[in-house]
């Protein structure tokens, strides 16, 4: 007669997490402390310790992890406002939203600067930035946001699982402040600049409540969106970066990447528009992305926008206010040991 092997409590937990889209490898890498080992996993009480860490890091209900008959449940105290592409099921973004919301909550709790609501027009914000900078760039927009107590974080460490979608940008409100979360995995500062400006537009236009745990999630930021709030956020971003929301750098003929890069530097200097933004604007209006992407590579050599964003975050958090587990998790989830 064959012996029936009964899975351990930890293996059962891993399997239940796998069933909701959290692979064991991801859970062990992101959800458990660095001292965790196979030997400890076999000890009495390991399941309780593991569940406590995993629930805190991934925004999961603790009791649903401890009860072996339950399906693990993500915890969101308010229904996110999703801005979706046609055909996207909101449920497919629930996991990424919950995990990113926890990162935003941790960041908000440790932000050094108090939140100062922005009582300026878009034109006045642009003018304020240009008083200190030649262009509105990712770096200068980060300066502005942090000066008003609005953290900006880049987080893209989501599990890879069938049916689980990621998003490009989010505004999450915790501890009476908005937090901008960028999740597009892209090294270009100009691309992430537009998404950050778009998310700032949602804040300026009052598209979400500043009460705790409110979320606005942009699956994808597109210039051609017909959603009224997306149109308004795009208009804010365009006016902030270009000076006018209807400004176009389209040309009659198609440019090569090198010619576009030279053109972008020339007209960008005159118009006080970042050359990378000029190149993207050309690509949007001409639908000539080969040259636009090539120009960005020439204009932004060796760029690492996610690192730039999180390096700034590293300097603006009160790390002593966080417990050891949250410190370790942020460093791991945001790649801070590499910035």
Model-assigned labels for residue ranges:
Residues 1-339:
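Active-site hotspot residues in diverse enzymes, especially metal/ion-binding acidic/histidine motifs
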